[in-house]
Amino acid sequence: MSTAKGNNAENRRPIYNPISNVESLENYVPGGYHPVMVGDVLHDRYRVVDKLGFGGYSTVWLAQDTQLKCYVAVKVGTVNSPVRETTVLRELSTAMSVPAPASQGRRSIPSPLDEFELRGPNGIHPCYTMALAECDLRTVSYSQLFPIEVARALSGGVVLAVAYLHARGYAHGGMP
């Protein structure tokens, strides 16, 4: 970090050299991201171990559940998150008649394990925990392509999950 030079102290503000593949520091403002650090304990239960990722409306952290003695993903939303994801995920996990083959996609929709709020300097942040995913497909496929059988199975699973979402009246807005 360096400082912008100006005629007086009021014109001096920090200039940050951006790092790729991380959220913007400018989003750590009221209404934005909640500051989380490795070692923090969230909700008197989840000890933060590492950062898993981020999106436009959240950061995701690997944490140890100190009660159940297992690892979970903790998603910490921004104050201004447009929707409560947990409401949608819980609704999607409830039994409802959906035509086949879309009904097969229900297995791919995770259910939240716990839901809570964090109060911080930027506001009140919605949070929830999930079971950890097996791996990050983008990272795994970066070094080499999947065998065709694996690629077909993964693609088929995504298609079934999206078909299930659509059959339930939802559309996923964050797909590349």
What are the roles of these predicted feature ranges?
Residues 1-41:
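Juxta-kinase regulatory segment immediately upstream of eukaryotic protein kinase catalytic domains
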Residues 52, 77, 113-119, 133, ...:
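Residues forming the ATP-binding cleft of Hanks-type serine/threonine protein kinase domains
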Residues 65-94, 99:
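ATP-binding glycine-rich loop module of kinase domains
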Residues 73, 127-129:
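Conserved hydrophobic/aromatic residues on the N-lobe beta-strands of protein kinase domains
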Residues 99-126:
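Short beta-strand micro-motifs within the conserved protein kinase catalytic domain, predominantly
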Residues 124, 134-176:
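Conserved alphaE helix
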Residues 48-55, 60:
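Protein kinase glycine-rich loop
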Residues 44, 63-66:
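Active-site beta-strand termini and strand-to-loop segments that position acidic
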